[in-house]
């Protein structure tokens, strides 16, 4: 009895308690079962996180569109169809969102009218400027007019006007 009361006398005394702990679980809820089930859930969470990233980006862009012009057709269309939002945001699921923006920016840059002072600017810079415009306007068509900014600073700033045609 004294050896059981004294923890220094028998150092191996707690080991039967450690062995007996898994018997407290019900048969269906053993920790091994939990360990087997977790890897099946991980891809679902990864997929959901990727979708949420795209949806958040689209939601931020749509908020900018809503602030720019209040009676937007796409916003009215999507109010009652929250479950099918992904189908409207991404017309082709194979093309990522940045690629769609780049394609839109290329079309916008080709449709833009440039003043003669800006003809010597590199086309990639014009596409970058048009990409900023395309990110602000996801729905509708935009033509970008680029003109030189103020001459006060030694750095020339290109300003652009976005014209939106709602249809």
Curated annotation (Swiss-Prot):
How is this protein annotated for GO cellular component? Answer: host cell nucleolus; host cell nucleoplasm; ribonucleoprotein complex; viral nucleocapsid
Example GO molecular function term?
A: RNA binding
Q: Tell me yes or no: is Ribonucleoprotein among this UniProt entry's keywords.
A: yes
Protein name (Swiss-Prot/TrEMBL): Nucleoprotein
Organism whose genome encodes this protein: Breda virus 1 (BRV-1)
Organism placement in taxonomy: Viruses, Riboviria, Orthornavirae, Pisuviricota, Pisoniviricetes
Q: What's the short name of a Pfam family annotated to this entry?
A: Nucleocapsid-N
List locations, semicolon-separated.
Virion; Host nucleus, Host nucleoplasm; Host nucleus, Host nucleolus
Specify residue ranges for compositional bias: Low complexity: 51-90
**Motif Nuclear export signal boundaries:** 153-162
Similarity annotation: Belongs to the torovirinae nucleoprotein family.
Q: What InterPro entries does this protein map onto?
A: Torovirus_nucleocapsid
Segments carrying the region annotation (Disordered) are: 28-94
Name of the gene this protein is made from:
N
Which cysteine residues pair off into disulfide bonds? none
């Amino acid at each position: 009895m004294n050896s059981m009361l004294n923890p220094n006398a028998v150092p191996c005394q707690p080991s039967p308690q450690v062995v007996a702990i898994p018997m407290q679980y019900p048969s269906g809820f053993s920790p091994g079962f939990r360990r087997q089930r977790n890897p099946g859930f991980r891809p679902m969470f990864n997929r959901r996180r990727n979708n949420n990233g795209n949806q958040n980006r689209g939601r931020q862009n749509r908020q900018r569109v809503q602030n720019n012009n209040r009676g937007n057709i796409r916003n009215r269309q999507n109010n009652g169809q929250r479950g099918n939002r992904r189908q409207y945001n991404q017309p082709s699921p194979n093309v990522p969102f940045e690629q769609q923006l780049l394609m839109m920016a290329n079309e916008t840059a080709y449709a833009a009218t440039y003043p003669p002072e800006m003809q010597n600017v590199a086309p990639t810079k014009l596409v970058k400027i048009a990409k900023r415009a395309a990110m602000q306007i996801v729905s509708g068509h935009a033509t970008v007019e680029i003109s030189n900014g103020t001459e006060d600073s030694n750095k020339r700033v290109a300003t652009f006007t976005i014209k939106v045609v709602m249809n």
